[in-house]
Amino acid sequence: ISQVKQIYWQDALNFLTKLTPRRAWNAAKVLASFYLTRWMKRPIQWGLPLTISFEPTTACNLRCPECPSGLRAFSRPTGNLRADFFRQTMDDLHKDLLCLIFYFQGEPYINPNFLDMVRHAHERGIYTITSTNGHFLSEANARKTIESGLDRLIISVDGTTQDTYESY
């Protein structure tokens, strides 16, 4: 358990290294607007988002029974996130943005530009997180992931056997 605590502490310290004075000021504005909104009972919005989420792709190599991606049941446009759109958005927001979540329902590693996007965010000092089913984590891809600067990698295991996987 002490090793797990150490990993969490290292991750928390890494996250805090992303906090610049400008990002701290932005966070203070967002927090103040939240409390003023509650107190005044009317919406007040100061600051820019602290965290955003990008879905690198809606595609997935699995067919999880509860997932719109796995079921191919999206009611919205599908495909890969365009790298140019991503870069422009990061260039517009990076000075105030603290954290970028790189997943939703697709498998991020399917997008061929995924690790380049992670690197782009990392170079701008943004804390990056992704979740994967792990199928694309070969030794070479794992090395590229580390080199990209990804801060947190979540590997989702949705069942240890086919029966438990299919049970939900």
Explain the meaning of each model-derived region.
Residues V4-R152, D163, S167:
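Conserved alpha-helical substructure of the radical SAM core
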Residues I155-V157:
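Conserved phosphate-donor/acceptor-positioning beta-strand/loop module used by diverse small-molecule
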